[in-house]
């Protein structure tokens, strides 16, 4: 019998309103079962800051100009995700998948920027992670 893994996936889309979390069990090839789907709304401060930064980014240069604010928001977003993981992930979760929060997406320029510190999330939650 193939080993079954339990994984927690975190997704925060361009709406910037919160985090969708799903726990699945899978052998990684043929078997899959959904254990849980849950939504976690960002607090007003995080929501406001995501949209303030997104509204002020029109070019790659804007990302550089806002680097201090972006780093501060990235830490807050990572801490929020860590609380989500801690509230859901018991000892049997093998992996955590972490997308981060999209703040800039320009397909024509082939640039996309997501906020989230995978290393910090792993340290805070004591879980293996993949960014």
Describe the predicted segments one by one.
Residues 1-131:
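Short acidic/glycine-rich loops and adjacent helix/strand connectors
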């Amino acid at each position: 019998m193939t080993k079954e893994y339990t994984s927690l996936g975190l997704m925060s889309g361009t709406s910037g309103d919160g985090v969708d979390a799903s726990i699945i069990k899978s052998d990684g090839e043929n078997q899959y079962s959904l254990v849980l789907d849950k939504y976690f709304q960002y607090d007003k401060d995080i929501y406001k800051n995501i949209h303030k930064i997104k509204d002020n980014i029109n070019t790659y240069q804007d990302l550089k100009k806002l680097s201090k604010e972006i780093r501060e928001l990235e830490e807050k977003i990572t801490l929020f995700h860590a609380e989500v993981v801690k509230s859901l992930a018991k000892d049997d979760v093998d992996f955590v998948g972490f997308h981060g929060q999209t703040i800039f997406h320009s397909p024509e320029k082939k640039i996309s920027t997501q906020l989230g510190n995978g290393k910090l999330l792993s340290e805070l939650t004591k879980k293996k992670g993949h960014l």
